[in-house]
Swiss-Prot record:
Protein name per UniProt: Zinc fingers and homeoboxes protein 1
Start-end of C2H2-type zinc fingers: 70-93, 102-125
Organism (species): Pan troglodytes (Chimpanzee)
One Pfam family it belongs to: zf_C2H2_ZHX
Record-stated family: Belongs to the ZHX family.
Keyword annotations: DNA-binding, Homeobox, Isopeptide bond, Metal-binding, Nucleus, Phosphoprotein, Repeat, Repressor, Transcription, Transcription regulation, Ubl conjugation, Zinc, Zinc-finger
Amino acid sequence: MASRRKSTTPCMVLASEQDPDLELISDLDEGPPVLTPVENTRAESISSDEEVHESVDSDNQQNKKVEGGYECKYCTFQTPDLNMFTFHVDSEHPNVVLNSSYVCVECNFLTKRYDALSEHNLKYHPGEENFKLTMVKRNNQTIFEQTINDLTFDGSFIKEENAEQAESTEVSSSGISISKTPIMKMMKNKVENKRIAVHHNSVEDVPEEKENEIKPDREEIVENPSSSASESNTSTSIVNRIHPSTASTVVTPAAVLPGLAQVITAVSAQQNSNLIPKVLIPVNSIPTYNAALDNNPLLLNTYNKFPYPTMSEITVLSAQAKYTEEQIKIWFSAQRLKHGVSWTPEEVEEARRKQFNGTVHTVPQTITVIPTHISTGSNGLPSILQTCQIVGQPGLVLTQVAGTNTLPVTAPIALTVAGVPSQNNIQKSQVPAAQPTAETKPATAAVPTSQSVKHETALVNPDSFGIRAKKTKEQLAELKVSYLKNQFPHDSEIIRLMKITGLTKGEIKKWFSDTRYNQRNSKSNQCLHLNNDSSTTIIIDSSDETTESPTVGTAQPKQSWNPFPDFTPQKFKEKTAEQLRVLQASFLNSSVLTDEELNRLRAQTKLTRREIDAWFTEKKKSKALKEEKMEIDESNAGSSKEEAGETSPGDESGAPKSGSTGKICKKTPEQLHMLKSAFVRTQWPSPEEYDKLAKESGLARTDIVSWFGDTRYAWKNGNLKWYYYYQSANSSSMNGLSSLRKRGRGRPKGRGRGRPRGRPRGSKRINNWDRGPSLIKFKTGTAILKDYYLKHKFLNEQDLDELVNKSHMGYEQVREWFAERQRRSELGIELFEENEEEDEVIDDQEEDEEETDDSDTWEPPRHVKRKLSKSDD
């Protein structure tokens, strides 16, 4: 970037002739007290000396003719053409200023010499110290415009003090934190005495200025133009006045050593903004700016969250802060101007999406710095370890300058990173800390000494980048062992696991929660309450497993906590054995839950009101179901004697008992018929309908709820073949499940599963239950397409979606079916095959029956038969 340079050594040496555009002033010994960056291959730091030797303007440098041309001092470039030489200097060495002039805007005073400008200031502006120089390039000429700044920090912008005089007044609250302003650049020349200049460059320009791609037309240089400086060997230069009790953090993006990729900066965003050095922006130039809004905590908090509020947010702020929307808009615009915030609409939207995910929004850079809490170390310097995501090249340097009461100290951090942003393990970075020097010694470059503090680890948290870290085998082993002991770990157990595994509390609790969820939803738990001797596999968060991970552990399920067979484990999924004992004791005392009892249970079990109330409700339903089953068992016991004579001993021996297990988890065809009929009526039954289904089918309410959820999912994905059969059928004509039974596979009344030798395979004895129609034909997908084809004779694309939904076929299947009909019509053959639909109905019904039930046939329970026989009589 273009800048100025003052040096006692000429930058450009002319061989023999003078350039008329370059004014040579050899009798000057001093130049302006400004230091600007120069190209250097060494890492540079900040230092100064009160003994200032102001030098000749860089635009008035001596040039030495070499073999009839011009030679560049900073490289081997030589040319006899002055224009080419000037172009080379501007393009390759933008820090070198040629052909400069000085203008006092207040007095319209123009001069080529800085000392003449200083004499003008002493004569016409006595006692004035708040000058500001603005560099402007016009017509291949650099002009420094001097203005008088009205807004101050109760003093100058840059104040030079001795090390013992580092005390100063507090920074004005109207200033802006450096952490939100363009980076302050402070550099020095190789071997010369220096002064400090503050260059306002946006943060976004830092990567680009490395390649010299952007050259701004204007650059502000803030300086203290006092020409007299006290000479001392024990002096230092302090930027902006550092608060006496503050360890301020400023940023120094310096040139790096060869081979290093880039220099990045890190400034904590959590430091008190009032204690950080400020950069002033004159807001009095905004006509309608209301300074009273600067002290409004609501607006400040809103701006700190996001600098671009929406119109709705501005309306809310206007109502809360009692200011007009226009004033609030102008205030936010001024704050963004002060802080150097200028985002494109796309960047604003992206930042709005990312403002809650833990990342700091900036224009895309090489590194995203995530602010973390800065803790003060034993040496008084703030810790400068911060979490950052490496998205560029490896081998970067994180540089930070921490200002204390005595000296500003730099502490570079060398990050040794593999350069892959999604890697699991970020290597540790060692932090050599510079030891502050309290004695009054000449302040040279603050270079880290050989002494180093205890090495700290900068471990990147992958969750901050939206990456879920894979747990190691050792971590998973510890978690599994703890899970087998207790699925709901106490705080002490979590703390122990945190120490052993190194995981955070949130990660451990989430792993336990996910594991409990996976175990509850595993297929082996469907009959857990019925098969006491079965083992249950614990599904351990499969996303944490790697290919080399050992197999998951198994454990015998504990059945003592679930004494009621009608309840699935899901109803007690979050309750411990102690909680269940308390609830059980309360239910035995009284099944009616009063408010006093509810409050007592809440305090004792730590459960919510809704959980306790739901448990009591399910308990009452379970009790009612048990009583109904007892009545059914009694009726079955009474009717068994009446039917004993109808069953031969051989057949009875071959018939399995109704209480036998083996397929007890399967739903009977009658139960499936009830559920399917209810699903066709409504996919989202009300609680009363769930209770009614549970009472009619004899299934647990949770099983019914689970079945409806699975069926809704299958319906959404188009996997229900029976839905349209039930939808188009007249449910009143379906007595039991006669329409779903296979033809010729029924069993005579009262007989076992065996078949007498003399009886044909297809014959059966018809009873009262089987008097309904043996087969009901429903329209299949092709039947719906056939009706549409007979009506329209072609496929209309507008009706394609409706046909797909009604026929339950895919888009390509529907199109192929109509294409086949068109082909048959052109060939003059039969459009539709005979008996096509009847075969499809029968096949689909048989496939559905085979998928949903393994039993060969189904007969109604005995108490239902008895009731039907009595009604017939």
